[in-house]
Design a protein with these regions (language model features):
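Conserved catalytic cores of very large enzyme subunits
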Residues: 1-169
Length: 169
């Protein structure tokens, strides 16, 4: 039994292990919805560099885990928001140690920092500069974020690395 994680790197490691367990025992893909919003409380107090390092390790790990049937990568997806969507702002924010610590609206900066770090990791690619195979990156396009600064960054990333998916919400 693992206690609830207290740090972002531990949370992302557990999510990666969950992907691997899913891929080894079940068929079909696995996804985490609003990934950056739910992870945001764990990024509180981190610098951008620390946050990006955690995200990069998570994505690299997802591309090294040949544990699915036939020694394949786990078919996995991350659903990403540009910020905390309106419908989540008043929800209790579960954070380090499994403790409710405010509302998700208290973690807008952290959710956006995770999105920005992820976009940078996607743009940089792997150690050879090639696109990451998994997880699939699915960005939620919501009217409330159409003019968000990270929307422009997403388009720059897609121009270089056309692997992210866009979901019109």
């Amino acid at each position: 039994y693992a206690k609830p994680p207290k740090h972002l790197d531990t949370l992302l490691s557990l999510l990666s292990e969950n992907f691997m367990a899913h891929g080894g025992f079940l068929s079909g893909g696995a996804a985490y919805n609003q990934w950056n919003v739910y992870a945001a409380p764990f990024a509180k107090g981190l610098t951008y560099s620390e946050c990006k390092q955690c995200v990069q390790a998570f994505i690299f790990d997802a591309n090294q885990s040949l544990v699915s049937k036939g020694g394949q990568l786990v078919f996995s997806s991350l659903n990403i928001e540009f910020s905390v969507p309106e419908f989540m702002k008043d929800l209790d924010a579960w954070g380090p140690g499994g403790v409710i610590n405010g509302k998700y609206s208290d973690y807008i900066n952290e959710a956006e920092m995770l999105t920005e770090a992820l976009l940078e990791v996607i743009e940089e690619g792997d150690g050879h500069g090639k696109a990451h195979t998994f997880p699939n990156f699915i960005f939620a396009l919501r009217r409330e974020f159409i003019d968000h600064p990270l929307m422009k960054k997403l388009h720059q990333v897609i121009a270089k690395c056309p692997t992210p998916y866009l979901a019109n919400m």
